Amino acid sequence: MSSLLNSLLPEYFKPKTNLNINSSRVQYGFNARIDMQYEDDSGTRKGSRPNAFMSNTVAFIGNYEGIIVDDIPILDGLRADIFDTHGDLDMGLVEDALSKSTMIRRNVPTYTAYASELLYKRNLTSLFYNMLRLYYIKKWGSIKYEKDAIFYDNGHACLLNRQLFPKSRDASLESSLSLPEAEIAMLDPGLEFPEEDVPAILWHGRVSSRATCILGQACSEFAPLAPFSIAHYSPQLTRKLFVNAPAGIEPSSGRYTHEDVKDAITILVSANQAYTDFEAAYLMLAQTLVSPVPRTAEASAWFINAGMVNMPTLSCANGYYPALTNVNPYHRLDTWKDTLNHWVAYPDMLFYHSVAMIESCYVELGNVARVSDSDAINKYTFTELSVQGRPVMNRGIIVDLTLVAMRTGREISLPYPVSCGLTRTDALLQGTEIHVPVVVKDIDMPQYYNAIDKDVIEGQETVIKVKQLPPAMYPIYTYGINTTEFYSDHFEDQVQVEMAPIDNGKAVFNDARKFSKFMSIMRMMGNDVTATDLVTGRKVSNWADNSSGRFLYTDVKYEGQTAFLVDMDTVKARDHCWVSIVDPNGTMNLSYKMTNFRAAMFSRNKPLYMTGGSVRTIATGNYRDAAERLRAMDETLRLKPFKITEKLDFRVAAYAIPSLSGSNMPSLHHQEQLQISEVDAEPINPIGEDELPPDIE
């Protein structure tokens, strides 16, 4: 799965092995050259933006809550000779294996009955998820949260942290949690039968005092004071954990470092052959490590209510029955160890994987939100139809990976149809009006938003009513993939506009697509435009924040024929204007082309530095071989992508099932290339050395 997540990063982005994060927000994006041209009956004007900047912002705060759920067992890691030819556990073979164990001398049928019950519950995902959380809480523990800080601000209205997280307190990431420790006990070799509801794990060698503390905290309740996304609330996994350790257990030290956590994870995965459990936990943390900072005030509605993180019940009998684990392990994928190996080598890559995953998910959710509920493929059915009727729960990482498949046009496979992880579609499915609390910054704010209060004063708190969820993120890493008019994410585009007689100086748009292109390219050139809706009389401006530099027409409230009037005499050049539009004459043709992409990443308005060796790609043959083996396995779950299609009014969309033979969509990625990473031992090379400053507007 690390190969898939690597492939979501664009080719121009070359991550390093070390990332220094000390702020709760990171702005990521790209600089690119944009060549623009304006032509009318009077002549042609050209302009270039050699260093245009487009970005999204993510934060280490989020509204999540963990809940314990029953999930399917993950059987990878058990000895292969207890499975039948269909990949199912055979209790007769289990009994044979137990009867040969030197640890079990009597009452084998009874042991087999206990083993049968426990093996069909086996799942270590939540334990690894919590251990991964502890790793990054320790590593980036100095990140601070301030409840009175601004979460979102666009000049008309702002949203404060305390409005989104009313029960929060100021804290650093590490100080936001005071974790108790569950009991970590040595498994008594003379124990007659498994203790009810007490998992038992295997361990190599002696459990150090620091590992004892890590395991105890990972099994305990997380009850945070501040809304850091990875420190979200979660219930206790177990009151007690048995460890079958040949050299014993040291008492808890009460302290440890993030490197100690990495060591403990590596030992635990290896001893229990739990590589697939770790992979599921890695995907869960990729879902929750960071959250989007919304692009609009209305998009904050995605995050008003807590997102549920499904955490599978911790169940493991490996410590009770080591004879069922320590021989030639069963596994569904030959690549089952890759995610752990990749994480051990490049733990900071999880940040980039998280950014890439949530961007793909929220960009595609912006498409799903535009689909009619009466369509066959809609917000309720897209996951079920993607897996072609396989029995899965419509929650967790399966939903996110379906969105990733739809965003990239790529088929994705999983070894098990697990339902663990964050379910981020709840806001979309609730189908009711969502109220977003904001602070007024401009008394004209009610003209732009559906606010409860129509007369406001600066500094007043009011509420924006949101019925249609707009996109929370724009395409950045996925810019140019499966492009739509909705997101205006083309590498090049053009529009032709017929002007009324010159003494009139007005343009009328009856086509939403043409209107959006015109407004977007005008904003890209550096011109402010205001249009009038000829039906309702309301105003629409081509406002866009500086980090996107493009107008995104997301208004879906309008029903019926689009009709907008633009008075060209009111067009105003911005402080930074690259193509000035003066006295337009006759037919206008506007076009642009983007080239020369360079990665950019900022924190606190300063470049965010990456150091160390490069994470590089190698030949794709290994992945393709693995993919062919994967397709031949009946047990695996395949998520098939749907193709987004826009209707005449592009604000409304629909999905169609495409050919799965491959995508020829032009993009910044090689669509079939899944990257496998290795360290290139080159000298330290901060990203800032080959980065240009963003446009200032």
From Swiss-Prot:
- Name the domain of life: Viruses
Q: Where in the cell is it found?
A: Virion
Region labeled Disordered — which residues?
666-697
Respond yes or no to whether keyword Transport is given for this record.
no
Where is this protein chiefly located?
virion
Q: Which residues form the signal peptide?
A: none
Provide the GO biological process annotations. viral translational frameshifting
Note the InterPro entries from the entry: Major_coat_LA-virus, Major_coat_LA-virus_sf
Report a single Gene Ontology molecular function: RNA binding
Q: Respond yes or no to whether keyword RNA-binding is given for this record.
A: yes
| Feature: compositional bias, Acidic residues | 688-697
* UniProt KW keywords: Capsid protein, RNA-binding, Virion
Query: One GO term of the cellular component aspect?
Result: viral capsid
Please explain the role this protein plays, according to its UniProt record.
Answer: Capsid protein self-assembles to form an icosahedral capsid with a T=2 symmetry, about 40 nm in diameter, and consisting of 60 capsid proteins asymmetric dimers. The capsid encapsulates the genomic dsRNA and the polymerase and remains intact following cell entry to protect the dsRNA from degradation and to prevent unfavorable antiviral responses in the host cell during all the replication cycle of the virus. Nascent transcripts are transcribed within the structural confines of the virion and are extruded into the cytoplasm.
Q: Which family does it belong to?
A: Belongs to the totivirus major capsid protein family.
Supply the name of the protein. Major capsid protein
Species name: Saccharomyces cerevisiae virus L-BC (ScV-L-BC)
